[in-house]
C-alpha cells in the first residue's frame, strides 16, 4: 500500500509492515492516515476503499475526502443513477467544466459536473459525514480517426469539500497520476513485478529501497531522461550517482 503527494509527485509512504501487513486495506488505511500529516489536504481514494469509516477518519484528521463511488456502495450508486441520468447531462444547468487532450494518436474529452447534496443524497449524508459535493466525470476517448473506436466512461464521486467543477476536475485528474507516476514507474522503470524475492521482510525492504531510488532519480533534473535511463546512468557513472545523492544531501 502506498500514499502519494500529488503536488510533488513522489510517494512518501511505503508498504505498511508489522501488524498492518496482516490487516486488510480497509482496516490499514485508517491507520495509515493516522501516520500522515494531512490537515488541510484533500485525500482522494479509489472506489474499493470508499467506506464510511475511512471518510470519518479523514475528517477527524482535519482533512477533506474525495471518494470514487461504484457498486460496493449500492445506495450511493443508485442515487447517482437516479439523479444524474445520462440523458439529462447534455443540458446540465449546474456548474460544469470541460477539458480536451490529444496526443499519441488518441483524443480524450472530459466533462466534469458538480452539485450540492440533493434528493436521496440528503438522507445518505447522515451516513456519510461531512458530505457536501457530488461529482460526475464523463470521458469520451477515441483511438485514431475512426469514430467507431470512441468509448465513454462515467465515474461518480462524493466529497466533503465544497468544490467547483474545475477544482473537482483537477483533483480527480491528479489522482490518476498515481497510476502513471508511481505504479508505472515501479513496474516498468524499476521492474518491481519481475522481483521474485519473497523470504521474510525482504520484499518489503527492497520495495522501500526502490521508492527511495525512484524519488532520488525523479528529483534529479540535470539529465533530461526517464527514470529507467537515469537508473542505468547512475549504475555506470560514479560521478552521476554522486550527483543524484548530492541533490538530497546524501553524498
Could you describe each region identified by the protein language model?
Residues 1-4:
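Methionine residue identity
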Residues 65-68:
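Short hydrophobic alpha-helical runs that function as membrane-insertion/retention elements
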Residues 158, 162-197:
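Short amphipathic alpha-helical "interface-anchor" segments enriched in bulky aromatics
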Residues 55-63, 85:
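Short, surface-exposed basic-aromatic patches at helix termini and helix-loop junctions that form
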Amino acid at each position: 500500500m502506498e500514499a502519494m503527494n500529488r503536488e510533488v509527485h513522489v510517494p512518501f509512504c511505503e508498504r505498511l509492515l508489522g501488524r498492518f501487513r496482516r490487516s486488510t486495506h480497509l482496516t490499514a488505511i485508517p491507520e495509515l492516515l493516522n501516520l500522515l500529516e494531512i490537515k488541510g489536504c484533500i485525500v482522494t481514494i479509489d472506489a474499493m476503499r470508499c467506506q464510511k469509516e475511512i471518510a470519518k477518519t479523514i475528517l477527524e484528521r482535519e482533512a477533506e475526502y474525495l471518494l470514487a463511488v461504484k457498486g460496493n456502495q449500492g445506495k450511493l450508486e443508485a442515487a447517482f443513477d437516479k439523479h444524474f441520468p445520462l440523458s439529462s447531462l447534455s443540458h446540465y444547468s449546474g456548474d460544469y467544466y470541460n477539458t480536451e487532450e490529444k496526443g499519441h494518436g488518441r483524443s480524450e474529452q472530459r466533462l466534469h459536473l458538480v452539485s450540492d447534496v440533493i434528493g436521496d443524497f440528503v438522507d445518505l449524508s447522515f451516513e456519510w459525514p461531512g458530505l457536501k459535493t457530488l461529482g460526475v466525470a464523463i470521458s469520451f476517448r477515441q483511438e485514431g480517426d475512426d469514430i467507431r473506436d470512441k468509448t465513454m466512461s462515467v465515474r461518480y464521486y462524493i466529497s466533503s469539500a465544497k468544490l467547483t467543477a474545475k477544482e473537482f476536475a483537477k483533483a480527480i485528474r491528479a489522482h490518476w497520476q498515481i497510476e502513471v507516476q508511481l505504479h508505472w514507474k515501479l513496474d516498468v522503470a524499476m521492474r518491481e513485478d519481475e522481483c521474485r524475492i519473497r523470504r521474510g521482510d525482504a520484499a518489503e525492504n527492497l520495495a522501500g529501497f526502490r521508492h527511495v531510488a525512484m524519488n532520488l532519480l525523479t528529483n534529479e533534473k540535470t539529465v533530461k531522461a526517464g527514470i529507467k535511463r537515469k537508473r542505468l546512468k547512475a549504475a555506470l557513472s560514479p560521478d552521476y550517482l554522486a550527483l543524484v545523492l548530492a541533490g538530497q544531501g546524501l553524498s
